[in-house]
């Protein structure tokens, strides 16, 4: 999830204090109302399949396998998308252009027990399968309680 900082304090570095305020206020409300996205990073789901298997699904319509790079280095998963040709459609004059292919980069810190098993791109969804193998020495262990049979009975007097 990406956050952008928001400040209501005027920037006095401009030549005129109010020179760009109305445009900035308009952009702020467009972002807050959802007219413009806060972030250009792809949306994703993370699902636990069972005790050891997980799946990360990214929504990246329009990207091809050759435009994606997935790597793991020092337990950090990096997924990058770089569009080779962002203007795939020739147009004399755009009346509205809402489909934009921005380059993106997502990073996830992985525990040392988590391994990426495979990645698959189909119908605009990139699915990564993970496996989390916990070594036996790190699994919780049940400790039984022994009660000796020769307990003394307390006599009432």
Swiss-Prot record:
Protein keywords: Stress response
For whether the record's keyword set contains Cytoplasm, the answer is no
UniProt entry tagged with the keyword Cytoplasm? no
Record-annotated membrane-spanning stretches: none
What positions does the domain sHSP occupy?
35-148
Q: Which CDD domains does the record associate with it? A: ACD_IbpA-B_like (cd06470)
Family assignment? Belongs to the small heat shock protein (HSP20) family.
Protein's recorded name: Small heat shock protein ibp
Q: Which gene encodes it?
A: ibp
């Amino acid at each position: 999830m990406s956050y952008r900082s928001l400040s209501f304090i005027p920037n006095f570095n401009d030549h005129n204090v109010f020179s760009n305020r109305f445009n900035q206020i308009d952009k702020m409300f467009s972002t807050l109302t959802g007219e413009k996205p806060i972030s250009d990073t792809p949306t994703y789901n993370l699902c636990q399949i069972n005790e050891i298997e997980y799946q990360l699904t990214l929504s990246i319509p329009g990207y091809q396998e050759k435009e994606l790079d997935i790597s793991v280095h020092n337990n950090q998963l990096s997924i990058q998308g770089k569009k080779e040709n962002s203007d795939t459609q020739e147009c004399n004059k755009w009346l509205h252009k809402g489909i934009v292919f921005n380059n993106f980069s997502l990073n996830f810190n992985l525990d040392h027990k988590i391994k990426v098993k495979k990645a698959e791109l189909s119908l605009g969804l990139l699915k990564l399968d993970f496996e989390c193998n916990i070594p036996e020495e790190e699994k919780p262990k049940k400790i039984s309680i022994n009660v000796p049979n020769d307990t003394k009975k307390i006599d009432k007097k």
